[in-house]
């Protein structure tokens, strides 16, 4: 075998995945479609280079161009979010959160985050995650009537438990979040406030959602999802003193060598996000989500949690269809619509089964879908879930999906 010879089975799988993406309507809220330039940066020769440390302070030689790349990513990120400090080295959103915890907390400290069935993330204190094992985690839920954040209840929980860190942000919440109310609660109990804006970072960057940067002590995010970049993480703050603690908590505290090829891809994505067209894109993402939510609300058997959406996603309660979230995910997969099962507030089913679906519009909007297309996708989903065993309905749905993906091909 020659050095560099492609492994046939591997490249067959990659080609098949490329075809799957082309042929599928992608509605997973955390997924998107990156530009060729982002992919090219991530596949560049930077993958060959070790660069422990930070720009100008490396443990290896030969980092002069690596320093330029990482500094560009930092500068673009700071400009994009109007932040004083940015660390672009976290390998993921989870690593970004872990780094902040390591910088601000000690094992056993109390943290307060959104519960999983309310829309929180594993790293916000789930008992099966490091965040719930290393720290004393307490959770807040949603108001059962409005299915929105209940700040008076959150305040009561904070006063009772005196957390050292309050975590705002979610992985499945469709409404605008009032960062200032979280700040007031944090100040009242003497806690740090961390915002995890992984899902809504693109909306924050364009002003479609209020920014947490001026309010929170520290903000974490992923760089994919609505930012349309490579899979990775980032930490932002306006507190430079805190930034120094975070830098050392990340390296050498949490990670070793940064993935500079991914950081290059982050820089390219941030550059794209700074262009006027990105604001137009995010505006369309929200319009598409709201169009889908409005269509779902016409259904007798599908209920939109909280009654609608202000961002890129929605949670739908499909209990009345008689189909579980797990079965709905598989059923929609069979007609080339990709979603993910999701717990609804107060769900009695396990997270592996669920009574709902999480649906997002970043990827279809990157393909050029507009409101009418989004409504049509919602109608297809409604018909499939109302007729899960009707083969004619499933065949028709698959044909409708093909028409939409042929109309809006991945560029």
From Swiss-Prot:
Alphabetically ordered keywords of this record: Amino-acid biosynthesis, Cytoplasm, One-carbon metabolism, Pyridoxal phosphate, Transferase
Pathway as given in its UniProt record: One-carbon metabolism; tetrahydrofolate interconversion; Amino-acid biosynthesis; glycine biosynthesis; glycine from L-serine: step 1/1
GO BP annotation list: glycine biosynthetic process from serine; tetrahydrofolate interconversion
Cellular component annotations (GO), alphabetically ordered: cytosol
Sites annotated Plays an important role in substrate specificity: 224
Chief place of localization: cytoplasm
Gene3D superfamilies: Aspartate Aminotransferase, domain 1, Type I PLP-dependent aspartate aminotransferase-like (Major domain)
Pfam family, one: SHMT
Subcellular compartments: Cytoplasm
Catalytic activity of the protein: (6R)-5,10-methylene-5,6,7,8-tetrahydrofolate + glycine + H2O = (6S)-5,6,7,8-tetrahydrofolate + L-serine
PANTHER family from the UniProt entry: SERINE HYDROXYMETHYLTRANSFERASE, SERINE HYDROXYMETHYLTRANSFERASE 1
Protein family membership: Belongs to the SHMT family.
Protein name: Serine hydroxymethyltransferase
Species annotation: Lactobacillus gasseri (strain ATCC 33323 / DSM 20243 / BCRC 14619 / CIP 102991 / JCM 1131 / KCTC 3163 / NCIMB 11718 / NCTC 13722 / AM63)
């Amino acid at each position: 075998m020659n050095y560099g010879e492609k492994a046939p089975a591997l490249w067959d799988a990659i080609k098949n995945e490329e075809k799957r993406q082309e042929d599928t309507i992608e509605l997973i809220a955390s997924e998107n479609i990156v530009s060729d330039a982002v992919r090219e940066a991530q596949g560049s020769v930077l993958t060959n280079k070790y660069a422990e440390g930070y720009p100008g302070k490396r443990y290896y030689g030969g980092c002069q161009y690596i320093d330029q790349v990482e500094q560009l990513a930092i500068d673009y990120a700071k400009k994009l979010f109007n932040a004083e400090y940015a660390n672009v080295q976290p390998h993921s959103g989870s690593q970004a959160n872990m780094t902040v915890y390591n910088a601000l907390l000690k094992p056993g400290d109390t943290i307060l985050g959104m519960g999983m069935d309310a829309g929180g993330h594993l790293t916000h204190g789930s008992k099966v995650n490091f965040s719930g094992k290393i720290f004393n985690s307490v959770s807040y839920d949603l108001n059962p009537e409005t299915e929105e954040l209940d700040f008076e209840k959150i305040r009561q929980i904070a006063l009772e438990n005196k957390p050292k860190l309050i975590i705002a942000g979610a992985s499945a919440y469709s409404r605008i979040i009032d960062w200032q109310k979280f700040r007031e609660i944090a100040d009242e109990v003497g806690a740090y406030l961390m915002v995890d804006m992984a899902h809504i970072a693109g909306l924050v960057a364009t002003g479609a959602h209020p920014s947490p940067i001026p309010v929170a002590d520290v903000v974490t995010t992923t760089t994919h999802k609505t930012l349309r970049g490579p899979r990775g993480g980032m930490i932002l703050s306006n507190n430079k003193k805190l930034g120094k603690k975070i830098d050392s908590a990340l390296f050498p505290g949490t990670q070793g060598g940064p993935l500079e090829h991914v950081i290059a891809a982050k820089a390219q994505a941030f550059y794209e996000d700074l262009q006027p067209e990105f604001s137009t894109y995010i505006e369309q993402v929200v319009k598409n989500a709201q169009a889908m939510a409005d269509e779902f609300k016409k259904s007798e058997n599908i209920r939109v949690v909280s009654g609608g959406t202000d961002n890129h996603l929605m949670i739908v309660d499909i209990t009345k269809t008689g189909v579980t979230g797990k079965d709905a995910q598989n059923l929609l997969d069979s007609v080339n619509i990709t979603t993910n099962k999701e717990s609804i507030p107060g769900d009695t089913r396990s997270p592996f089964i669920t009574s709902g679906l999480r649906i997002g519009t970043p990827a279809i909007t990157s393909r050029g879908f507009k409101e009418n297309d989004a409504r049509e996708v919602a109608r297809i989903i409604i018909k499939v879930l109302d007729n899960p065993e009707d083969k004619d309905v499933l065949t028709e749905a698959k044909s409708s999906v093909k028409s939409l993906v042929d109309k809006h091909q991945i560029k």
